[in-house]
Each structure stands twice: as C-alpha cells, then as structure tokens.
Amino acid sequence: MVMNNLNPTDFTPWPEQFSQRYREQGYWQQRTLFDYFSDSVKKSPDAIALIDEFGQYSYQNLYQKMISLAAGLSSLGLQRGDNVVLQMANRAEFYLCFFALTMRGIKPVLALPAHRYLELSYFCQHTQAKAYIFSDDIVGFDAQQTAQKLRSSCPSLLHTIVCGQSSHEQIQELDTLYHCAEDDPVTDSVFADQVAFFQLSGGTTGTPKLIPRTHNDYAYSVLGSIQICQFGPQTRYLCVLPVAHNFPLSSPGALGVFYAGGCVVLASDTTPHTAFRLIEKHHITVAALVPPLALLWMKYAESATENIASLTLVQVGGAKFSEAAAMRLPTALHCQLQQVFGMAEGLVNYTRLDDPLSVIVTTQGRPISADDEVMIINDEGEPAAVGEEGLLMTRGPYTIRGYYRAPEHNQRSFTEQGFYITGDRVRRTAEGNIIVTGREKDQINRGGEKIAAEEVENLLLQHQDVHDVALVAIADEFLGERSCAIVVPDNGKTLKPITLKRFLHAQGLAEFKIPDHIHFVDELPKTPVGKVNKKWLRTQYSH
C-alpha cells in the first residue's frame, strides 16, 4: 500500500501493479533520501563531503548540522506535510536545508536563483507554503524585499528565513535555527513512497508546473546514475550549475556524489576562470555543464594557465549539444565527454563511458533503467520505425504520473496509459540510443533554461499599448536558442523594446525569460485555420 502525504487530487500515484513491480525489481528500496546520506556518514564520517567558498564540511559535520537544523525548523511549528519554498545560491546551506526538511517530511519547492516575485508568489500560493527560505547573495536580486512582499501577498506564509544577515524584524536568520538535537533524527513518520520535494517544469503554459518527486523514485534515479557514471569515494565533483537544477542534483549530481562517498565542490559563479581555478585547487574529476558553458570552457582552455589534468569526465546536458562541439570537447579539455538528456519529470538518458566516440558525439544516450518504457510516435500517430523522427513519450520507475494540483494540464501531458508526453522530438538508433531533433511544445530552451512562450505572451498582452504578440525561438550558436517577441502595437502606438523589457521586469519576471529580441509588426501571420504561424516567424527572424 502506498503511504502518501498529499491529497489524492494533488498527487497522481503509480498504479499498484507498477509500484509492486518496481519494488520487486529492487528499484524502490523503501528508504528515504536522508537514509542514503546517513550510509555515507557511517562509512566515512571524517571524509570531506562538501566545499563551498565559505569552508569545507566532513560527512559527520553535515550530518550533525542537518539534524540540528531539522530540530530548529520543527521548533517553528513546521511539520510533516507542510511545504516550504527554498531558493539558494550555490552554497552548503542548500543541502543542509534540503535534507533537514525532507527528513522531517516537509516538502521543499526547489526554486531557482533566477526566479523572481512572479514565480515565487505562484509557488507560495499554489502549495500554500508555510515558509520561504532564501540566501541573500543571489546576484541582482533583493531577496529580502521580495520576502516582505511575499509575506504580505501569501496568507499561508508564516516564516521568512534568510541565509545571511536579516534586514527586517519579520525575517529570521537561518543561523538561529541550529538547535541542539539528538544524534538520531526523527524520520519514523516519513515513508519512501511519500513526496519528498517539488521540482519545476520548463512548462509550455503559464508559470512552471510543480513536479512531485518521491523518495523512492528519486533515489533510484540517483543510484542508477551512480552505477552508469561510475561515481565513488574518489569522485570530486564541481557544481557550476544552480544547485537546485535536476541535472546537478541527481544526474548523478551532488546527491550521487554524497551517496557514493565523494566530495562536492560548489562554484560561486559560472565563469571559466573560477571553474578552472577550483579544478586545479581541489583536483576535480567530474563537472556537469550546459552547452553554452561547455563552449566557454573550450575557448578558455586555449589560453588557460591552470592545471586541469585531474578532470576525467565532463557531462553536457540541459540542451542539445551540437555534433561539431561534441567532437571538439575531448581534445579541448583532455577528458571524456558524456552526453546527458533528461527531464525533471523523470526519464534520464546517458551515453555510456565505454561507448564508441561516434555514439558519444552523435547521440544523447539511452535510459537508466530496463523498465524505462520509451515510445516514439510519428506524425501519423504510429510507433516510429528505427531512425524515424517522432514525439517522445515515456513512463517508468522514476517518471512522474502527474503534476501537482494541475488536473487540466495532466490531461494534456499524460496518456490514459500513464505515458508522459515530453514534447521532445527524437529519433532512436538500432542500438537504442536517442538523438534529439527538436521540440514539439511551444517552449524555448535558452541555454538549458526553459521558457513557456504563453507565459511571456500573456504578460506582454497586459501592457496597454500591446495588441497582439508571439514569442518564438530563434537559433543561436552559443545558447542553442534565444527568444524573440514579435509585437503588434495597439492602434498604431509607437513602442520601443526597452519599454517592454522594463515592463516585464516590473512584473517580477525572471531575467532569463525577458525576450532577447523584440520586433514590431502591423499584424501576425496566420495559418489557414487562423492560428499564429510561428513556424513562419521562426524562419523569418532566424536570420
């Protein structure tokens, strides 16, 4: 029987016959995310687990601080079943909060540093969050001012907690919550079938959808990734990407490093200079990058003076990595390339470490699990032949069956048989490797950050001088895609791009969602059935 901490209308469980199979196959081991961390503490308590710009922590140090923080959070009245929005820069406190919350059955919503008031208020209201925990060192963001605004607009929000120095009496400092606690944390009321936390979808409509991840499914994804990527106590992993992203959290990411007994090193910024300095200083062996960062690293390496000989593996994912760039990377960085194609909703594909170079360069790999069911449907609605392009659908032991509190969206995103409709267009080789060819959903992938066109369009339409608008992706050599807004002004009004960009900023939209380009036209082109012809717009404005 599945024990869960959400209302049945909020969470879509796996059907019992699937749950039973996943348990029998050993995928779901009925242990919490914190249980696996505790295993590493017992094996190597004095080993260094984490290094950030402020210091380093052994496994035992982290363990004790997690338990202490969990006690402090409980003293505020936070309890099993509550939701908390967590937004942190790349620092140790992210993992301390993540484990302190999940070990008590409190579910963090993993907001990204790029999110602003518009997204954060939605997360708080949609989940009825009891607390907002944040760091005050997110570049270009007055988080404490935003916290005050959230406190006023979200009735459920009882606590705002800052990692840093508080500037307001209603904002509590995280450092005051490290309470004395017993060595053994209270986890007896937390079941592995329960939702542990929420991740965020890229989304194609409105604000991001919330992805409920259970202890069982997420742990299996991490453990399977560890095996494929051969992480172990010797692994020294550089986290350059935002810590809350699925890729650097679980593929195998920081959780994979912790569970394998290795060491995570956090970069405070994304510059190659910082990364290469950390690689040399801490003898980094593995790093995970999105394509734009991989290109920057390759360029920087041409004149770099740092010694990065310890680096043995670079993972590239989050967006399609061009074949030409993939071919160059092993030589440019003197290490192995691994392509990763995954999604926060579940399915993750890897090229294997022993794959031929031709496979690593030209494909995005194959799934973690033998029970990852992958269907590719062609334009006629039939299963695609080998090598034929089609729409990717999937279900499996770590792919969700529904978004949180989104019944209408779930009807569009999941089939009656429980397959998740990814929106990715792919081909599959005879060996089972997947090649990503594009997107079917109305979504822009800007260097790994997903933008729902409809969300930005709806905000622009709120401007009094905008009559109509279409947001499309245009190809970009560096980011993969950039966003381009084609705007029809109202009644011949004169508008400037900067005016609309300032308007979107004022609405609290995340910086990466602000259109890179804005063009003005008299009318938008239409298809024969009266829809905006975005295909024509993409072609027209890509030059």
Model-derived segments and spans:
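Structural core segment of the AMP-binding/adenylate-forming
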Residues: 3, 106-175, 493
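Conserved AMP-binding/adenylate-forming core of the ANL superfamily
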Residues: 29-30, 34-38, 46-91, 95-99, ...
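Conserved AMP-binding A3 loop
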Residues: 58-60, 196-220
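AMP-binding/adenylate-forming catalytic core of the ANL superfamily
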Residues: 115-122, 132-134, 287, 396, ...
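Conserved AMP-binding/adenylation subdomain of ANL enzymes
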Residues: 219-236, 246-286, 299-300
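Gly/Ser/Thr-rich phosphate-binding loop
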Residues: 284-288, 298-359, 373
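Conserved beta-loop-beta connector loops within the AMP-binding
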Residues: 360, 375-393, 430-431, 493-497, ...
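Conserved ATP/PPi-binding loop(s) of AMP-dependent carboxylate-activating enzymes
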Residues: 367-371, 382-413, 451
